[in-house]
Amino acid sequence: MRHRVAGRHLNRTSSHRLAMRRNIVSSLFEHETISTTMPKAKEVRGFAEKLITLAKKGDLASRRRAIALLNNRAIYKEENGSNVQVGTVIGKLFSEIGPRYLDRPGGYTRIIRLPKRRLGDNGQLVLLQLVGQDDKKLSNK
């Protein structure tokens, strides 16, 4: 029986789930909106919100804890046909994303269902995005 078992296995090993969670959240912080399946989005949502709460504190211990929980990968931007490093995921989290939500007590992400389904397994696709970054675009449409 499956009583009191938290989390989703997503048909992966524990190390694969951890790597997938880190990669999805890193991509979310880098691009601020990503397309994924509904179970993956629901699984990583709490992890992303926990990291944003750490970024709101902004102290050294919170930064070190966020680095331990998340891969501190570089963010690249294409300039003149070559990729140039413009920062890191943790740097963006603590300098841009954390201060953006200082007056918000929680609920930093939103899940929007997409009308199309994934080709192959017919999985429900969703947009996982940070709240506040596309509010102007949504209100204009």
Feature-to-residue mapping (PLM):
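Structured, basic alpha/beta domains of bacterial-type, RNA-associated proteins
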Residues: 2-11, 19, 23-141
